[in-house]
Amino acid sequence: GLKERGIDAKFCATGQTGIMLEGSGYPMDRVIADFISGAAEQLVLENEHHDVLLIEWQGSLVHPSYSAVTLGILHGSAPHALVLCYEVLRDKVTGVEHVAIPALPQIRRIFEVLSNVHQPCEVIGVSMNSRRVSEADAHV
């Protein structure tokens, strides 16, 4: 990881599980919507003395129920780079099965367009959940 390479990195939790693991952070799903961006910005400001901040995401920009939280964190944290989390073969939004999940290239474009509002930002990686495919297919 980053710390093993001598990089001063900090995980900034935005959900209850992340807070339990890290010991600090803000539970963004409990913040009033008008203040999510400010809470994300405050989380960054409190930890800006580190070289790299890894901001935990909540929800998804393509989930109609939780996209406001995701967008608030995105704009408030003003990232320089993103790592997308993607589940292979998942084509419907959980809990709202009539809503299709776009293909990964389209999700990447959505995130990059919305993250470039304040400063340059790009997707630098994908964390892939491959539980629905074989190990051989996951390595393709």
PLM features per residue range, with description:
Residues 1-140:
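Flexible phosphate-sensing "switch/lid" loops adjacent to ATP/NTP-binding sites
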